[in-house]
Swiss-Prot record:
It catalyses: RNA(n) + a ribonucleoside 5'-triphosphate = RNA(n+1) + diphosphate. It is found in: Plastid, Chloroplast. DNA-dependent RNA polymerase catalyzes the transcription of DNA into RNA using the four ribonucleoside triphosphates as substrates. Mg(2+) binds at D489, D491, D493. This is DNA-directed RNA polymerase subunit beta'. Its cofactor is Mg(2+); Zn(2+).
Amino acid sequence: MIDRYKHQQLRIGSVSPQQISAWAKKILPNGETVGEVTKPYTFHYKTNKPEKDGLFCERIFGPIKSGICACGNYRVIGNQKEGPKFCEQCGVEFVDSRIRRYQMGYIRLACPVTHVWYLKRLPSYIANLLDKPLKELEGLVYCDFSFARPIAKKPTFLRLRGSFEYEIQSWKYSIPLFFTTQGFDTFRSREISTGAGAIREQLADLDLRILIDYSVVEWKELGEEGLTGNEWEDRKIGRRKDFLVRRMELAKHFIRTNIEPEWMVLCLLPVLPPELRPIIQIDGGKLMSSDINELYRRVIYRNNTLTDLLTTSRSTPGELVMCQEKLVQEAVDTLLDNGIRGQPMRDGHNKVYKSFSDVIEGKEGRFRETLLGRRVDYSGRSVIVVGPSLSLHRCGLPREIAIELFQTFVIRGLIRQHLAPNIGVAESKIREKGPIVWEILQEVMRGHPVLLNRAPTLHRLGIQAFQPILVEGRAICLHPLVCKGFNADFDGDQMAVPFSLEMQAEARLLMFSHMNLFSPAIGDPISILTQDMLIGLYVLTSGNRRGICANRYNPWNLKSYQNQRFDNNNYKSTREPFFFFLIHVMRLELMGRKESIQIVLCDSGGNQSNALLLQEKLPSKFTMNLRVPIMRFMDIIQQQEVQKKKFFVYTFEPLLVIFLFTEKSKKLYKGFFGPTHMIPNHMVSKLKNSMTPI
């Protein structure tokens, strides 16, 4: 169990089989050693007690009730005069039941099994160290390939050693048929190597320091060759150099952490404490079990079957032994990471089992949900909103959060100013929230920075310090320029406000937001405009635009009065709401011979107008609603050869004028939409002169 007062950090890595055994083994007073889980059972269906040597065994993992063994005997915990520490009949230790939260067990595997994280995860650590393709290693692990052992002085079984290379698979269908289980095991251990045992042997033979030296020499040789001029060859050399760098870094990491490469192949499989994979009884007597229990049972079943084939059965073909080894490997893979090799394992309801990887990774995993996401004293949490009027180093703190964070300081201030005789009276004054409380709170907040933390904290700028100020409401106000460091936006993100004395000293020196203007990873500016600010600037600076980008404060729009309409009844200028306008529809019929015409749509001021000219009427959902969101309409100047055609004009302008200019007659025809409005002659001539005959 990790002592929180002695250990301030956590490291995850590979461990030796001896360490796994030391975690679980216990020696009873009679000399018996317990810790190995050998049976796939959980609870007895009649007595409802854990099965001996099963996944919930009290001898291995500790008693279910503190101080009570499986027989029902009771001992006072920690009392040496009561008698022995273990029950002489059932072998259960008289300890606190909380031991079942951290006491582990182990499964002794009948064959070595590779850890799927080191084999299948990219980049594959095993493939990097052995310098072999991942596909070949997978075939070796799952007994599809084999290779000949390097025997020099011993006599070989066959003269043709080449038939045992993993590229030639003829031996799989002929050799095992002539051996019993013991005979094939002897032959295989002497002549060939396959399965995870072959990987373990190769990893054990590695000398990491020599591997680093060889990699450095090869990298230098590739660098001295230079470019060949062949693009494909140059890429191949570049990939090889990158691989050598990764290989050297991995080997150095193994040396620094004192981890042996062969530990990536498991001989002992750790079993999690029972409290971390519980079985719970619900209403109606039904039991709910963690998925990991079912995956452990699958491993134990297959491992026991393989053990029986290797020890008790004498007539089992060697091929069946290899198939069972493959099943054990697949069962352990499913336990560690379900679905990493393809189709995941499912239960009877077609639901995917949650493996060990699923339990610890992700937002709802063990680390982020339970360890990193825990609440601490003197902290609060609320939604963030934009505060553009704030300074870069300030944040707006809601009154409810601030009074809770600084409550102890406010109590001290009330007592020092003789406004409250004791803590109880001071707390009652705080609950009343009088004006003096807010004055003392503001005085206290001037010298106390706070930390804002947004999960997930993936880099250093996920936590920054700010000088708080009181704001109304229940949301934390944040300057928009610091959002990129937090990877935050204002669509409901929540932030935590931790508070402690050590935090204040570190915050003043290192963590104020105005001291973290650049990214520590790449050095680029981190306090830059993002998301909402960029959209707002685009809208504010967009030119002569209609639709959703229209802005009444834009000088382009003010100049042309695009949002303005005239009421002919009282001749008063009015404006439509900013986001919604009226859409006017007009049916236009053109009569004439086959000739080209030019259609120009103008408003009452003679300016070219935005409108949509269609030969077919739009669906009713566009035309029946008088008020619809602003749509962007294009300027229509098009040629049509008409005899009698019908057009529909959609526009925002109630006083639209349609000018038709024909090529042959060189005449200008005009029509009106809306109330009759006379166009001055000089405007008509101006428009006629501006049009070029087609």
